[in-house]
């Protein structure tokens, strides 16, 4: 049994959020111990059930700065200026995310980021134990039992409080549910995903534009590619579970090859191992997790995907989890007891987590159905014009979510107003030449207050 220190916390899960939280709290004087069910990725290679490449935005970078980790992480990241949209017929077109290269996002491979944060967590003083799968928890006595799956040996610890940073399939959440129901609900999409890879050129370098997120939108399904710093692309096909085409009708490598030849012909020669990878990589599920509460008084708390998992279509799951880490560290500084800190953390983050979950679902429809739609493209043009004219009032949705740290709930509310303005102003128009700009100025000033941080 391990003794408990006065200012100690036990983290379950040494993934991205767990490692970042360990850095932040260790630097603030907490004694942090982390338990991870898998092995050390620095020794045995990286294993992860969900390895979609990560899009690092300003929210995530801000959290990394707080932890002194930004410089190390950014050395491994690749800039993405926008979406490179590949139509079925015609040339790819770049849709910029922002106004210039100061408004971009960054692609980073999950494994590289996890290893970097793990190193920094240990350097900050956190102790990390691998091959420790949470088995049972006695919340009243403050004891937890872990199992080493290599030899089935149990390991018991005494804890002051547990923080669940162990992802959407959280073992701590399951233990909390057994103690006191959390009102857990998971809504799965009727789509799943499969991950593939575009290798680098024989001499190194990218086979397609390296500073973009590539999208092949095809209505009810799509294919995306995110760059890595080694010249590869991590590519992901999102496909319905039933219907035509779907995972039900694309069961093997030959059927996958036929699908790509028909619907993604320019991508097919980029993926020489398509058939092999298709049969080796099982489809991954996509879902949104909601809970009625995230904590068990001061004894346990869930953060990140363990509390509010979301679909990956806004590139904000990691960024949101990193914001959680900073918010929790701040609440622990502000309160003398854990129960108050946990309650304040949940109160501060709940509405924002729900908002980004909703926006992530909406962004899937945009990426899949609308990026090549003429009405949507006209609205994008108007959005850029309105931002240029009134940059502190009409702040594009993507800017608020990705380049600023506007609260997600505020970004959602403002985005809904702005969408109404764009739809109404462009209705019946094929271009912007006949718009009533004076009327638009009145509407924008009446409905949108200046936004903090916008420029």
Swiss-Prot record:
This is Kynurenine 3-monooxygenase. The gene is kmo. GO terms for biological process: anthranilate metabolic process; kynurenine metabolic process; L-tryptophan catabolic process; NAD biosynthetic process; quinolinate biosynthetic process. Its cofactor is FAD. GO terms for molecular function: FAD binding; kynurenine 3-monooxygenase activity. It is an enzyme of class 1 (oxidoreductase). Its EC number is 1.14.13.9. It catalyses: L-kynurenine + NADPH + O2 + H(+) = 3-hydroxy-L-kynurenine + NADP(+) + H2O. Pfam families: FAD_binding_3 (PF01494). Belongs to the aromatic-ring hydroxylase family. KMO subfamily. InterPro entries: FAD-bd, FAD/NAD-bd_sf, Kynurenine_monooxygenase. Keywords: FAD, Flavoprotein, Monooxygenase, NADP, Oxidoreductase, Pyridine nucleotide biosynthesis. PANTHER family: KYNURENINE 3-MONOOXYGENASE. It comes from Xanthomonas oryzae pv. oryzae (strain MAFF 311018). Pathway: Cofactor biosynthesis; NAD(+) biosynthesis; quinolinate from L-kynurenine: step 1/3. Catalyzes the hydroxylation of L-kynurenine (L-Kyn) to form 3-hydroxy-L-kynurenine (L-3OHKyn). Required for synthesis of quinolinic acid.
């Amino acid at each position: 049994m391990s003794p408990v220190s006065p200012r100690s916390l036990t983290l379950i899960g040494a993934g991205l959020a767990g490692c970042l939280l360990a850095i932040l709290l260790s630097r603030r004087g907490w004694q942090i111990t982390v338990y991870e069910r898998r092995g050390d990725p620095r020794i045995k290679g990286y294993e992860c059930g969900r390895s979609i490449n990560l899009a690092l935005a300003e929210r995530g970078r801000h959290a990394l700065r707080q932890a002194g980790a930004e410089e190390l992480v950014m050395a491994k990241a690749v800039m993405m200026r926008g979406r490179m949209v590949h139509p079925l017929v015609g040339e790819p077109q770049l849709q910029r995310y922002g106004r210039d290269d100061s408004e971009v996002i960054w692609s980073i491979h999950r494994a590289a980021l996890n290893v970097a944060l793990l190193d920094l967590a240990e350097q900050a003083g956190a102790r990390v134990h691998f091959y420790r799968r949470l088995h049972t928890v006695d919340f009243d006595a403050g004891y937890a039992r872990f199992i080493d799956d290599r030899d089935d040996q149990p390991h018991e610890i005494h804890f002051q409080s547990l923080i669940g940073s162990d992802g959407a399939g959280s073992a701590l959440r399951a233990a909390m549910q057994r103690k006191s129901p959390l009102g857990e609900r998971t809504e799965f999409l009727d789509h799943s995903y499969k991950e593939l890879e575009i290798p680098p050129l024989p001499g190194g370098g990218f086979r397609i534009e390296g500073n973009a997120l590539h999208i092949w939108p095809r209505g009810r399904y799509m294919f995306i590619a995110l760059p890595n710093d080694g010249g590869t692309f991590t590519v992901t096909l999102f496909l319905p579970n039933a219907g035509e085409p779907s995972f039900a009708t694309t069961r093997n490598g030959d059927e996958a090859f036929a699908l790509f030849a028909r619907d993604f012909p320019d991508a097919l020669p980029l993926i020489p191992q398509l058939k092999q990878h298709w049969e080796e990589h099982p489809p991954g599920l996509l879902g949104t997790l909601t809970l009625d509460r995230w904590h068990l008084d001061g004894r346990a708390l869930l953060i990140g995907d363990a509390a509010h998992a979301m679909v990956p279509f806004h590139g904000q799951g990691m960024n949101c989890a990193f914001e959680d880490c900073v918010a929790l560290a701040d609440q622990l500084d502000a309160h003398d007891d854990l129960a108050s800190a946990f309650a304040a953390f949940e109160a501060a983050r709940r509405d924002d987590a729900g908002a980004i979950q909703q926006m992530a679902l909406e962004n899937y429809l945009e990426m899949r159905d609308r990026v090549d739609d003429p009405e949507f493209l006209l609205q994008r043009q108007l959005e850029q014009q309105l931002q240029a004219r009134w940059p502190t009032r009409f702040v594009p949705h993507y800017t608020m979510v990705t380049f600023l740290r506007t609260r997600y709930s505020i970004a959602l509310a403002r985005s809904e107003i702005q969408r109404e303005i764009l739809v109404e102003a462009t209705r019946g128009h094929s271009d912007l030449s006949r718009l009533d700009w004076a009327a638009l100025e009145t509407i924008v000033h009446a409905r949108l207050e200046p936004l903090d941080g916008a420029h």
